[in-house]
């Protein structure tokens, strides 16, 4: 164990055996024990924050509503690497030559392709998962940065559409808030096949306003099927792209979004199916 009894007193002589269970903390009659995490300890399958959360759940019989995603450090702007030019084209002298970051996406079929000043798109996060204020802030930020933001699968807030210079209307498996008018309001339509993270049910977050935007009952569990029920193969994806293109009168690009998996095969299918943009 962690402790050994010496002359009737417990001493933590084997601290390397501690798994963060916190039983000693609960059993100590004098509340004299404090359990602290070891930041450099990488041996545990369940980290210290995980154990603390498990204990909290056991005590409260409920889970904490919080953001989800990987706990590891994610890349930021300092991690962006621009592929250097060497022989194929002369390097740019940054002191004398301008460097453009503007890009045009989806000009093969769409009458109004996406034109971005900054080629870093804001990921899809829906209203309900984010507050109205957060969605409005992303819309304002995307406009200031000259890029595009995304409705996510929770429908489109009128304020979001008003504040975002460019806004992608997501078409996900749950089809929350989806209509022809919704699709036509977007500067692009994104068919979400997969994504990097997925939270749980979240029915307690379906307020009256979320209900109105998503067009589902208040307090209901907003469940999204694991896949689009009408997209089961390559031909179905091609038909869906064509359908959305017709609904939007060929005016905006059609995007297909995948999670990381069999990337080469999936991208090939989406490109053959007529996708304007693949993310």
Language-model regions: role of each:
Residues 8, 125-127, 259:
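Short strand-loop junctions, especially beta-strand C-caps/beta-turns
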Residues 31-32, 36-120, 124-164, 169, ...:
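Conserved, well-structured core domains of diverse proteins
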Residues 140, 144, 155-156, 161-163, ...:
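Alpha/beta enzyme core
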Residues 1-11, 23-41:
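Iron-sulfur cluster-binding cysteine motifs and their immediate structural context
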Residues 16-17, 27:
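Short pre-active-site segment immediately N-terminal to redox-active cysteine/selenocysteine motifs
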Residues 12-15, 128-129, 231, 257:
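Residue-level marker of alpha-helix boundaries and capping positions
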């Amino acid at each position: 164990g962690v402790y050994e009894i010496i002359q009737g007193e417990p001493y933590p002589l084997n601290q390397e055996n501690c798994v963060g269970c916190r039983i000693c903390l609960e059993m100590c009659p004098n509340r004299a024990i404090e359990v602290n995490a070891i930041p450099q300890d990488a041996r545990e399958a369940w980290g210290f924050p995980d154990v603390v959360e498990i204990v909290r759940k056991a005590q409260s019989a409920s889970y904490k509503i919080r953001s989800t995603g990987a706990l590891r450090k994610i890349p930021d702007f300092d991690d962006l690497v621009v592929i250097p030019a060497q022989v194929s084209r002369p390097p740019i002298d940054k002191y004398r030559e301008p460097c453009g970051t503007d890009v045009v996406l989806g000009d093969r079929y769409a009458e109004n392709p996406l034109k971005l000043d900054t080629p870093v798109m804001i990921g899809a996060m829906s209203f309900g998962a984010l507050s109205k204020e957060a969605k409005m802030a992303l819309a304002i930020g995307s406009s200031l940065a000259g890029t595009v933001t995304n409705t996510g699968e929770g429908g489109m807030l009128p304020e979001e559409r008003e504040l975002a210079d460019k806004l992608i209307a997501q078409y996900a498996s749950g089809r929350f808030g989806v209509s022809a008018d919704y699709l036509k309001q977007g500067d692009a339509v994104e068919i979400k096949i997969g994504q990097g993270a997925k939270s749980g049910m979240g029915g307690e977050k379906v307020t009256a306003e979320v209900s109105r935007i998503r067009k589902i009952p208040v307090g209901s569990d907003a469940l999204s099927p694991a896949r689009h029920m009408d997209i089961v193969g390559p031909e179905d994806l091609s038909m869906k792209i064509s359908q959305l293109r017709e609904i939007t009168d060929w005016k905006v690009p059609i995007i297909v979004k995948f999670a990381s998996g069999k990337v080469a095969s999936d991208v090939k299918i989406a490109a053959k199916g007529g996708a304007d943009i693949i993310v």
